[in-house]
């Protein structure tokens, strides 16, 4: 395999930055947050430079659940403003990027009527983050009514529905026969988040020469003149002065701040792993929808069809962000155990 190399045009642009090393805003991190910030500033005519140490959108933005999540599970913690904002942004993406973002029918299997109903008000008003109890039909009904209410004026998604055990099993015969109800609502998903991110990036780059984006360039230090950048292909370092530096490194935010001489402890250091299964039986059992439920250990579990396969997730495991982040054999076995139930 031939080593990576920059195109002549990209090398010319980077050379121009070395010879005129200043910008109004320097954005560090080319995931979706960095790219979206870059686009917004570029379209406003602000001189802006974006740097990414690897491929654009190659980190957490690509290794996600591929959902455009309206935030239904945050209702129980009283994060109502977050849910309203998430629904608004979800519906905007459904309208503006229907070639990438699609409605996702989501079904919740329910095994009790009132479980969690009395603990929920405490969590709602105290914003407590403790391990939740199993959610029964009444609690889920209240939550989905609120979810429909918050999203009613922002899109045309169908309202939620409930089915009893008999109708649920007739519709989805592979479902656990111990269920008492199923609740179905709509969220959204996207098969290729990287493609949407590149479209957003292109909007910014095409705004004019005042907006420059470079991959395989990392922020490695700080000097009085500005941020020290390193060309990851040549190893050359140079310093860029900026009026404002925006750190959009995602899970690596603290490591970037440390490199810039400003140690922080903002990020929790956890990972959520997923696997993608080529299993026709499971694909058929999903019936074109997401199955969304809570495991006995308190973790949220999701599985849904994606590109003729089935995505299953997710874990919540502490990690050191200096290490390579991978899905371990133990996590794979955990997912297999979930699917086999």
Q: Where do the PLM segments sit?
A:
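Extreme N-terminal leader/targeting segments of oxidoreductases
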Residues: 1-25, 40-44
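Helix-loop-beta segment of a Rossmann-like dinucleotide-binding subdomain
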Residues: 22, 126-133, 149-159, 169-211, ...
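Glycine-rich Rossmann-fold phosphate-binding loop(s) that bind the pyrophosphate
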Residues: 29-31, 53
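N-terminal Rossmann-fold NAD(P) dinucleotide-binding loop
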Residues: 34
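Active-site substrate-recognition segment that forms the wall
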Residues: 40-43, 47, 51, 99-106, ...
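Dinucleotide-binding Rossmann-like beta1-alpha1 core, especially the glycine-rich loop
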Residues: 66-169
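A conserved short coil-to-beta-strand element within the FAD-binding core of flavoproteins
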Residues: 215-227
């Amino acid at each position: 395999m031939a080593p990576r190399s920059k195109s002549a045009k990209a090398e010319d642009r980077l050379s121009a930055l070395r010879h005129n090393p200043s910008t109004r805003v320097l954005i560090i991190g080319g995931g979706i947050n960095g790219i979206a910030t870059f686009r917004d500033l570029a379209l406003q005519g602000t001189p802006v430079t974006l740097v990414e140490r690897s491929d654009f959108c190659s980190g957490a933005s690509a290794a996600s659940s591929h959902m455009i999540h309206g935030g239904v599970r945050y209702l129980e913690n009283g994060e109502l403003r977050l849910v309203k904002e998430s629904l608004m942004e979800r519906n905007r993406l459904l309208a503006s990027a229907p070639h990438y973002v699609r409605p996702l029918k989501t079904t919740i299997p329910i095994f009790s009527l009132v479980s969690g109903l009395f603990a929920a008000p405490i969590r709602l008003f105290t914003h407590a983050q403790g391990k939740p109890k199993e959610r029964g039909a009444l609690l889920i009904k209240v939550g989905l009514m609120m979810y429909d209410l918050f999203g009613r004026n922002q899109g045309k998604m169908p309202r939620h529905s409930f089915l009893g055990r008999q109708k649920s099993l007739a519709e989805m015969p592979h479902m656990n026969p111990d269920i008492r109800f199923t609740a179905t609502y709509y969220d959204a998903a996207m098969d290729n988040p990287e493609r949407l991110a590149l479209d957003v990036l292109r909007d910014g780059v095409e705004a004019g020469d005042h907006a420059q984006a470079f991959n395989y360039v990392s922020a490695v230090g700080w000097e009085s003149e500005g941020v020290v950048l390193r060309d990851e292909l040549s190893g050359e370092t140079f310093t860029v002065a900026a009026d404002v530096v925006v750190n959009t490194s995602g899970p690596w935010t603290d490591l970037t701040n440390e490199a810039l001489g400003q140690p922080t402890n903002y990020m929790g250091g956890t990972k959520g792993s997923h696997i993608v299964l080529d299993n026709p039986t499971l694909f058929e059992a999903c019936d074109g929808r997401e199955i969304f439920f809570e495991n006995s250990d308190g973790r949220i579990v999701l599985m849904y069809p994606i590109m003729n396969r089935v995505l299953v997730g997710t874990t919540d495991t502490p990690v050191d962000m200096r290490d390579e982040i991978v899905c371990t054999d133990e996590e794979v076995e955990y997912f297999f155990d979930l699917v086999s139930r």
